[in-house]
Amino acid sequence: MFVGRGYEYFWTQWTIGSAEFSDKPMPRPPEEDLYYDFFKAKHTTQYLENYTNVHSHAGQTLRDRIKFGIEVLSVDKLDGKWVISTTNIDDNTLHTFHASKLMVASGMTSVPNMPVLPGQENFGGPIIHQEAFGSSRILTSPDIKTITVLGGAKSSADMVYAAVKAGKTVTWVFKASDTTGPGFFLSPKGKGPYKNAFDIGMTRVAATFTPSFINSDTWWTRLLHGSKYGVKLMGSFWSTVDKETRQDADFEHRKNLGGFKDLKPHTP
């Protein structure tokens, strides 16, 4: 179910114990698949696969209850019940679901947005979206030696990393107007009692360091983001984080990694 988008060098942004359901802890991955308690994403995939198989309600597992290839036509509430009219995208058969509760997870970015590239019909190699990266043979094919990745978000950084680890020659393309490089790079290391950066970020104090509508509007958040002293303090904090990240990455001194210095962010 979840395997198609995974690949060998795909790592999580979360750590052991933070991405599991309370009724089924996730087994700890082997140490070779861990880095400051971040781990290869394939272990989350396996965990979710197992979870859908072992949880059963009224004689049906979660896997039995998941329906793929279904398009929702309408949602109505009649006599206190939800009525969901759907069609199967493969054979156009209609089906109506009835439920006492409805959760909408619209997945606004679940449909791949493929750019139109001039002359792509004359290009001899495969052109794929990140969605198909894991199920493709791009990383394992000996005939594919050069890979170009378009875009600067996390998924692009993941693909660049995976391609380099697979021994490919990689070109990373950004828009001319994008002067800051990849979306976000951060050292995984923790400080004090925290083993990694994720654990620090999950604390209530650290969560207030980034402006968010999710945070409550308190004197503390107004001080940090609404006063000149707070803005100066936050600027100093993030400058320190940026400096430490650059030091850990050592972009400019890895002589055996050609082009690694070009990954250095161009933060103003």
Segments predicted by a language model, with ranges:
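Glycine-rich dinucleotide-binding loop and its adjacent helix/turn
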Residues: 44-47, 104-170
